[in-house]
């Protein structure tokens, strides 16, 4: 977001535009620099003065108003992916309020800058609905002893010590946030805080699902419970504890992290609680952890399949489990309803399922479901529910 090169002589770049009697840029013009950057804007006797916009070689841009050659006031930096940083500048340096947005226009950061470094109370927003709130340190990092991770319900929190945004130790709290998302005016008011358990960053490995497998997630515990499924031969299922709206995160899907090649090369009987996380990594809940007597840190693996689901899988950046999947509603769900997702095993032309792409129980259900169902519905399921 550099706004330098404030004095521009004609021989410093390829300049096109109005000039003064001394052959300096004066009025509207455009300069192409040897770096590949380009500036279009207003000049006064060789100095940027007035509205202007940098077009950088990496396809990002920076626009705003220039005073005596320096960006002053609101400047808008647009990355090549469409994400935006809207900041206050003083003499070319970020100084004051700043906002950041993802390519879809959702806010991802709000806070303050001093001499180009983040300072004071800052708010970090994640696309899954969670957020981090706290005072950054002198380096602008979210490293302190009073940081709050806020769950999507904006009342359940984990408050404690964080290092560069990673949770070190934290306790469950009930909080009140003043102001809508993106417009909060202060650190959350803590209504109550539990003395235990203490939560820590606990990202799984290929061999360890959790160092504390019997410590449940406080947010998930308020929304769901496991009980025998109403679906025949499905074992346990997951049920809603209360009425919830569409697009509500209900449960988290943590597990050991395996390579996709390993998962794809083993028998389907070993993949009953396995889900893809990325193109390379899958999450798996091994058989010994299926029972809540042995593992209840997350319950997303309890959600069963349906061709008419009320939920879908989504990604989630969890303060304890790291990057995982979650279960999110696709319509309103009532208290006592069983949560279901579409497992999205690959299939083609109506009732025909690729033999190598789905377990037998799924192929049997698909044959039943496929009767009198338009082929295009089946073909589009993966796009609708994954």
UniProtKB/Swiss-Prot annotation:
GO terms for cellular component: chromosome; nucleus. Keywords: Activator, Chromatin regulator, Chromosome, Methyltransferase, Nucleus, Repeat, S-adenosyl-L-methionine, Transcription, Transcription regulation, Transferase. Signal peptide: none annotated. One of its GO terms (biological process) is peptidyl-lysine monomethylation. It is an enzyme of class 2 (transferase). Residues 1-21 are annotated as: Disordered. PANTHER family: HISTONE-LYSINE N-METHYLTRANSFERASE SETD7. Histone methyltransferase that specifically monomethylates 'Lys-4' of histone H3. H3 'Lys-4' methylation represents a specific tag for epigenetic transcriptional activation. Plays a central role in the transcriptional activation of genes. Also has methyltransferase activity toward non-histone proteins. This is Histone-lysine N-methyltransferase SETD7.
């Amino acid at each position: 977001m550099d706004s330098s090169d404030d004095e521009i002589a004609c021989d410093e770049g390829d300049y096109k535009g109005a000039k003064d009697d001394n052959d300096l840029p004066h009025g509207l013009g455009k300069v192409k620099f040897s770096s590949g950057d380009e500036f279009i804007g207003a000049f006064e006797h060789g100095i940027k003065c007035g509205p202007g916009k940098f077009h950088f070689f990496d396809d990002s841009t920076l626009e705003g108003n220039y005073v005596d050659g320096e960006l002053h006031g609101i400047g808008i930096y647009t990355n090549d992916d469409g994400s935006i940083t809207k900041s206050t500048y003083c003499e070319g340096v970020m100084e004051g309020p700043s906002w950041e947005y993802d390519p879809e226009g959702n806010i991802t950061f709000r806070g303050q800058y001093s001499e180009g470094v983040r300072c004071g109370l800052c708010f970090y927003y994640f696309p899954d609905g969670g957020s981090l709130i706290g005072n950054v340190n002198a380096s602008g990092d979210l490293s302190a002893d009073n940081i709050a991770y806020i769950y999507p319900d904006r009342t359940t929190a984990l408050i404690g010590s964080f290092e560069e945004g990673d949770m070190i130790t934290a306790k469950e709290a009930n909080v009140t946030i003043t102001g809508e998302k993106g417009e909060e005016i202060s650190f959350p008011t803590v209504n109550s805080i539990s003395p235990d358990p203490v939560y820590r960053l606990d990202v799984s490995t290929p061999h360890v699902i959790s160092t504390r497998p019997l410590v449940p997630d406080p947010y998930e515990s308020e929304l769901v419970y496991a009980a025998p499924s109403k679906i025949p031969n499905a074992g346990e299922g997951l049920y809603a504890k209360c009425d919830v709206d569409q697009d509500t995160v209900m449960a988290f899907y943590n597990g050991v992290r395996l390579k996709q090649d390993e998962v794809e090369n083993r028998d389907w009987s070993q993949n009953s609680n396995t889900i893809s996380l990325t193109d390379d990594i899958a999450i798996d809940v091994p058989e010994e952890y299926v029972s809540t007597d042995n593992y209840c840190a997350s319950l997303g693996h309890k959600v069963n399949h349906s061709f008419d689901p009320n939920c879908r899988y989504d990604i989630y950046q969890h303060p304890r489990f790291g990057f995982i999947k979650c279960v999110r509603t696709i319509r309103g769900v009532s208290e006592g309803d069983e949560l279901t997702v579409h497992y999205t095993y690959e299939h083609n032309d109506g009732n025909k399922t690729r033999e190598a792409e789905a377990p037998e129980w799924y192929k049997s259900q698909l044959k039943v479901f496929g009767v009198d169902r338009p082929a295009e519905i089946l073909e589009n399921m993966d796009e609708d529910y994954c």
